[in-house]
Amino acid sequence: VRSDEPDRPSRRKVLRLSLGLLVLPGLTLPGIARAAPLRVVTLFQGASDTAVALGVTPCGVVDSWSEKPMYRYLRPALAAVPHVGLETQPSLEDIVLLKPDLIVASRFRHQRIAPLLEQIAPLVMLEEVFEFKRTLAMMGAALNRQQQAMALLGQWQQRVTTLREQLKARFAGRWPITVSVLDVREDHIRSYLPASFAGSVLSELGFDWTPAAREAQGVSLKLSSKESLPVVDADLFFIFQRGDSKAAQNTYEKLVQHPFWKQLRAPQDGQVWRVDAVAWSLSGGILGANLMLDEISKVALGTRSS
């Protein structure tokens, strides 16, 4: 597609996508041509995930946060795709060389370089990197794949409805139970909140949250010491570690042996579930969210916790 053709979107056009926009069949976002762009660069993990879900292979992606250079679950689709650097610092030179028809970025990561990105190609600017439904809807519209996006959202809603009923049956008389999502790192533990990627999925499934989680702002709480553990006390824990760090593993081993840990409800009831860090914290897209549902379904089925 040539830049001087009438159906080519303005290279200076930035789509600042409004919150909660409903994508309907036939909708084309302002400034984006009706013909699906052939070459798309995705500058955050959730956008790369979403492109694959929509059946689009980007011409450029950013490095993954772990399992480098690309998350294992996306490698079959993206193994041959060129990389343009880090999500926090993509290479403008590499992006230019790829000659994209569209760039998908986020205000959270890329607001400062947006004027430069829009000189390269039309720019779809999402607000956040982890709001997977919004990313799916907006990319579906920008890529002229609204029907695929709506189908994926419909399948998601059906899965959530079914799993919610299974969880209600599994915890009959106790539902909704409280939940905490714990990220064990090298030098501290982080508890994810309802506003996080994982938190939004758990809330949609009907899980309840601890008072501290409901009152806190942001996406996570940092627990600087084991003495803070009572703050996250809940009926069920989902817990993961970032990467294969020996230091993080040591932190985990010390955690589960600590007297305060053993006094918490989830450990006492055998409701501590080890889950995948990529799916729960680093993926940010509809495919990663579905991987979360796969793991949560083990809880609903009563598969043995760890």
Could you say what each language-model-derived stretch is?
Residues I113-D187, Q271, A279-S306:
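Extracytoplasmic substrate-binding proteins
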Residues V84-L92, A216-S225:
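Short helix-initiation/N-cap motifs at beta->coil->alpha
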Residues K99-I103, A234:
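Proline-aspartate-enriched helix->loop->beta-strand connector
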Residues Q217-K246:
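Ligand-binding pocket segment of bilobal, Venus flytrap-like solute-binding proteins
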Residues S48-L97:
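A short, structured surface patch at a secondary-structure boundary
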Residues R39-L54, L152-A212:
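Basic- and aromatic-lined ligand-binding clefts that recognize polyanionic substrates
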Residues V1-K13, G20-L27, G31-R34:
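N-terminal secretory signal peptides
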Residues L38, L236-S306:
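Structured C-terminal subdomain patch of bacterial secreted/periplasmic proteins
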